[in-house]
């Protein structure tokens, strides 16, 4: 992008990332990226990912699947400030 368009393009990308996405899922993904990059072994990423997949079957995860199947916008109730019980164990 030309320098004068870069900031608006970054804002547009950020908006696409957060629109109709679970705040908890975004926060967990961000933390997984930050923490797993420094992990000593790839198995750590697998363990965290497995727990995150389990969590996806509850709360906002269920709402995300239901809204997709019902072809409607999701209504997420989870807050990034109220992370799941397993966070941050890694």
Segments (PLM) and residue ranges:
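Short alpha-helical scaffolding segments that buttress acidic/His motifs in well-ordered protein cores
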Residues: 29-33, 51-53, 68
């Amino acid at each position: 992008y030309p320098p004068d368009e870069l900031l608006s393009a970054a804002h547009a990308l950020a908006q696409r990332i957060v629109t109709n996405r679970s705040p908890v899922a975004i926060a967990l993904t961000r933390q997984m990226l930050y923490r797993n990059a420094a992990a000593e072994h790839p198995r750590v990423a697998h363990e965290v990912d497995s727990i995150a997949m389990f969590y996806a079957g509850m709360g906002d995860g269920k709402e995300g699947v239901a809204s997709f199947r019902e072809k409607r916008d999701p209504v997420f109730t989870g807050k990034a400030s109220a992370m799941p019980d397993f966070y941050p164990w890694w």
